[in-house]
From Swiss-Prot:
Its main location: secreted. It is found in: Secreted, Extracellular space. The keyword Secreted applies. Gene3D superfamilies: Ribonuclease Inhibitor. This is Leucine-rich repeat-containing protein 17. GO terms for biological process: bone marrow development; negative regulation of osteoclast differentiation; ossification. Residues 163-214, 350-402 form the LRRCT domain. It comes from Homo sapiens. Residues 225-268 form the LRRNT domain. Involved in bone homeostasis. Acts as a negative regulator of RANKL-induced osteoclast precursor differentiation from bone marrow precursors. The gene is LRRC17. LRR repeats lie at residues 82-103, 106-127, 130-151, 269-290, 293-314, 317-340. InterPro entries: Cys-rich_flank_reg_C, Leu-rich_rpt, Leu-rich_rpt_typical-subtyp, LRR_dom_sf, LRR_TM_domain-containing. Residues 1-18 form the signal peptide. The keyword Transcription regulation does not apply.
Amino acid sequence: MRVVTIVILLCFCKAAELRKASPGSVRSRVNHGRAGGGRRGSNPVKRYAPGLPCDVYTYLHEKYLDCQERKLVYVLPGWPQDLLHMLLARNKIRTLKNNMFSKFKKLKSLDLQQNEISKIESEAFFGLNKLTTLLLQHNQIKVLTEEVFIYTPLLSYLRLYDNPWHCTCEIETLISMLQIPRNRNLGNYAKCESPQEQKNKKLRQIKSEQLCNEEEKEQLDPKPQVSGRPPVIKPEVDSTFCHNYVFPIQTLDCKRKELKKVPNNIPPDIVKLDLSYNKINQLRPKEFEDVHELKKLNLSSNGIEFIDPAAFLGLTHLEELDLSNNSLQNFDYGVLEDLYFLKLLWLRDNPWRCDYNIHYLYYWLKHHYNVHFNGLECKTPEEYKGWSVGKYIRSYYEECPKDKLPAYPESFDQDTEDDEWEKKHRDHTAKKQSVIITIVG
């Protein structure tokens, strides 16, 4: 009996010990689980912690870096140098400093939209000679010069809209660059924010020379007259001063009539209009709007200094345009855009100025290779005097290293070809006129 009692007591003691030990075991297991859970939960925090590398991936065999919305203020040093595309949109970058991207020499596209960029230093894009796409829209850029883009000769797509552009003399070179015909995808939709007189004007359409010329500003905004007398209204020039010929083609001859402007009421069926040897020093918008059948227009020897971009609006059938022996230094962007069927363009004996503003005329002629022209020779500045405009433009780009030059037509000079063409054309014209005279006789 004693043995049975001892055995029962031992069982109760063992059970009591197990009961005491079990809560501790549960707590230890719980604590262990919490510790393990804490370690597992720390991984996502590290993944999104600031300072860690951005997403780098390859798509269609091209390497991308995606660092969007990371509150970055600068380029991180650990990024791969063989990147082809860099996405840095929606960050906090305020300044693009010199050599900021110089080690990414293979970069093709750079997305910097929706940052806080207000300043771009002159060598910020140094080394990006393969860059084709640059997105700078939705920033705080007010002033920028063409100098910034010297190191991106292959740039084909540039977005600048939704920036508070301050359209003054400081951005004149940028506007001139955007208005070159080959740059048709650079700076589209970008508009001036200030000053008030330029607000909402597109950078690609604004006249760059008006940004710096105070005299033209006074002409656009004349001061009110002090005198109480009404302004003198000069009579409009009427086309009845000119001679109208029907044979061999409908011709209006206004040659040597001392005209100071294009006459009104030009018959709409006129095919040839001769306004040479007058005193018309500028062509206003829509001067020939109603002369839809016009094919030959002679404006030589007038002293023309300025042609409004809309002056030739409506001349969709014009084939010959003579602007020789005037005072033209360059063409504003858009002057020739309506001349779809132009074949002959006479430009000799004008004081062509070889600077950035001459590029529009030259590249328009290169793009419209079926248009024969002559006389495109530099008169100023002195260092380029006597050069063909093609030679000047080639030298303009030769100042850059050869590996940074954009792809342009191999042939820039057309002088010899133009001289031969002009001689043949004059001989051919003389023969045609002699035949006509013989028939009339």
